[in-house]
Structure formats: structure tokens, C-alpha cells
Amino acid sequence: LGNPGLAQVQAGLRLPAAALVLGLGLAGGMALGRLLAGHWAGWLPGTVASGLGLWLAWRGSSWAVAGLLLSTAGTAALLAGVLLGDHVGRGRGSIDRVALGFALGLVLQVGLLFRYYTATGSGLYLGVAWLIMTLGATVWWPSREPGIDRVPVYPTALVAGVLVALAASWQELRSPATLSAAPLPDQITVMTYNIQSGFALDNRWSLEETARTIEAAQPDIVVLQEVSRGWLVTNGADNLLWLSRRLGMQAAWGPASTDGLWGNAILTRGSVTAQELWRFSQAQNLRRSALAVRVEAGGGSLWVIGTHLDDPRGAGAVRLAQVEELLAFWAGRAPVVIAGELNAEPGDAVIARLLEAGLVDTGARLGPEATTSEDGRRIDYLLVSPEITVLEARVLDRWSSDHRPVVATLRMPWAE
């Protein structure tokens, strides 16, 4: 009924404001569902509101907040109206039908989610899900007013929604708009890390372990890949918000998926003064992007670009095409750090092209044991422009993901 991550990304809201919008939508939807239940066309307003709201929210325009309110309220109204019907929970036969309906619905949901995520958040499958939801509400819509024993659920849900809205409003008023930041020193530590949305090598989910791995290197800048802002398949948590708050670092978001909930991110203790996003035009499986930020340091500014190139072993041509787009996106800005999972080993044409463009591989002097992926390859890189001095590079021996983080200590050119 409401995804705080989607509300933050599509409408540009902070978490408390996102929770406020969704809470008001839920409360309004429950009230609307109670009023419409029993009318033969009562499903129509909820259908129109949810459909129009999804369209507005998906566009991410200035109408996104209104879209979130409408979609949440419309969906909640349809659910409330159906659940208030006399056909729900009346006798053993009715219970069996409801249980079967829920079971089939869950199976259908899993199938749709699988297709949705393999298409990297395609709106097509969201539309299919909306059609199925509204069709089900139309078929199951109650034909008469709910009985008196059904009504108490209405004020309870309404009060709960209002309380959520009030709590979110209070949090919005008392929380700072941004975390504190200061110019970085002339010597900094940079990390690149594919966090697999917080899942460790043994598939155990723990963002706390992810945070501890990052803390072990005490980095000034962290470039992250496979960051989820609320995908259900990745536990529904907003990885970026949680890690930013937990580590006390500024966050920049670079979505790759169409819905804006999965992609790359950059955390920094410095002040971010510019941010740019590039979406690659070619991809073989999941959509990919690159994120660039300009971070202020004591004697100048540093550009940091994070990316995650295509994964399949047979996608070499696609990765080369993505590298050409990446180099055009970089456009020679210096000094620069380009970091991320490139899905190419040293000596691959992808790495050769980046070195040919003048970049330096900070891990070039590492031994063959310095692998970064679970299958024993070095495919995660920290590349720098030649005016940056590489003081140290290492791979942390920690498996809080299916990748190990790469860390480098760098001296900025103005420190010479």
C-alpha cells in the first residue's frame, strides 16, 4: 500500500514526509472504502484514484506527491471495501475460499515480482499488477452495506493512520535536513563495495554487518553498488538511508532501475557540491547507470564516479559500449576517482580501454590472491587520474556481501 523508498525517490521527500503522505493516504483510503462499500459501483472511485495516482507517482513530476496520495488511498479503499463485504469470513466455505484466494494471490505476486525485478523495475508489470488488483476488487466488491459488526475496523484503521501521520510530522520537524559535512583532508581513504543489498555470502541479511565492514576501513568516501531503496526482494529496506544514518555520512543516489529503487550510491564525509546521473543506453540483463559527485577537499575539489557494468560473462561487447559511454560521461574532469564493479578482470578489453584513457588502476600491484568476487576474480576497481598519488591499496578480507571491498589511500595533487 505504500513504499517509503519510492516516495522519497519519486517525489524527492525526506523519510518523515514520505511516511506522512503514505499515512494520510492509508487513513483516507480506509475511510473512503467504508463509505463506498455496498454501492454497486463503489469500486470505481478507488480504481480511478489508484490508476491515476500510480501514473502520476511513476512520472516523478511535481505531481508525484498527489500521485502517491491518490494511489495509496485508492488501493486502501479497494482493499477496505472488499474486506468489509459479507462474503468475507462467513462460514467455513467462505473462509476456505478466502484462504485459497490469498494463496493464489501470493503465488501470482511472486511471479509478477520476479518478472518486475528481472526487468529492473519496468512499469509494464506494475500496470499488469494494477489491472489484476482492480479486476479482483470488481469481482469481490460487496453488493450491500456491511453489517454493524464490520464497522469497528473503520475508526480503528483511521485512528492508526492519523497517528502515523502525526508521528511522521513530529519527526520531520525535529530531524535535521542534512548531516553535517566539512571539506575532506588532502589525504583520503576511498572504498568501493558491492553490498548485494545487505545480503552476506551465506545469504544472511544484515545491514549492520555491511556498516561494520565499511567502518573497518574508516573511509572518507564509499562507492556502493547493488543498493536497494525498498525492493521487496531485497527485504524492503532503504539501504541508502539506513547506511547514511548509521555511518553519519552524506549520501548521493544514482538509480539504475526504472522505478528508481535500485542502483549505485556514494557516501562521503565531505560536502557534495554537484551531482550528475548517466543511464547506459545498452544492457544485456539489468539496467545500469553511473553516478558522479563533486566533493570539496581542503585545496580543491574531487570528482567521484561510481558505476556497475553489465554482468553476464558473454556481455563483453555490451560492457565495452558502456565503458565508452562512461568515458564520455567522465569527460576528462580531474582529479577523478572512477570506482565500482566492472565485471572484467585485469587484462580484459574493458580495463585496457580505461587505462588507455589515462586512468590508473590502484590495485595493479596487488597479488593474485587479491580477488574481490566469490568466484575468485578481481572485478571491482578503484581507478584514479594520474595526478592523484596512490599511497596504498588493499582488499578487505570480509564477506558481508558476495564481494569484498577494495580500499585505497590517496593523496590529492594540491598536497604536493
Task: For the regions a language model picked out, list residue spans one by one.
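Metal-dependent phosphoester-hydrolase catalytic domains
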Residues: 1-175, 294, 333, 344-416
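C-terminal luminal/periplasmic domains and tails of membrane-associated envelope-modifying transferases
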Residues: 286, 315, 415-416
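Structured beta-strand-rich core segments of catalytic domains in phosphoester-bond hydrolases
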Residues: 121-123, 170-182, 202, 221, ...
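Active-site beta-strand/loop signature of hydrolases that rely on acidic residues for catalysis
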Residues: 188-195, 206-236, 254, 267, ...
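N-terminal signal-anchor transmembrane helix
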Residues: 147-150, 158-208, 212, 216, ...
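Surface-exposed cleft-lining segments at the edges of enzyme active sites
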Residues: 9-15, 197-199, 277-281, 308-315
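Active-site environment of divalent metal-dependent phosphoester hydrolases
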Residues: 199-200, 229-233, 259-261, 312-314, ...
